[in-house]
Amino acid sequence: PEETSSGDRYLRPNKLDNNQEVEFIVLEEDPVEYWQTFGENIVDQTAKAFRFPVTAEPPTNEEILEAMGGSFRRSKCKFDNPKQGLVKGKTDSPPVHCYVWPIYNLDKNCIQVFEVSQPSIFKQIKTKTGLKKYRKGIDLDSEFSCTLHKLEDGYTKYTFDVCDREEDEKRDEKIADEWETLKKDGFDIDQLVLGGDPFNPEGDS
């Protein structure tokens, strides 16, 4: 596969354009989960994700600040959320429960990490994949692919769906080979929780 930039290695719903739909195949059905929050570098204000293993309760402010180590401060909320008592630009952005899956993006023809931090999307994934039709799975061995559509109209709405995959044995074999090669090369999605790069677990430059 061609070299891809780090941005191409992740499918993040909030990065989709308005009215964009992406189609992908799930490569492993069980997601990796973690708490995630963002910090801002106190020198140049660049953002960095800080991740924590999933426990019953989100990490405390003390745990977050300890992980940030003094060179980052907590990012502020980008939106008001009266239900959660969050004020845009004032309240610390709270940790969110994330779910990630390795996927094959059929539009970009590459393996990516699909990261979901939006409860509305995860709820749809859980509901759709729980249907009797998909009880044997929706991974590469199945006949299905998934779509995610983003629409901004006053607020952002995401629609997740499972659909019949266009039959193409050669393509599916190519995807399976790429996935096996990537795993042999050390791909490790659990690295995300440890602050590492799943595509480069050894940290090679």
Regions found by a protein language model. Give the residues of each.
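OB-fold ssDNA-binding interfaces and closely related basic DNA-contact patches used
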Residues: P1-V113, S120-K123, T127-R135, Q191, ...
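Compact mixed alphabeta submodule
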Residues: N109-S205
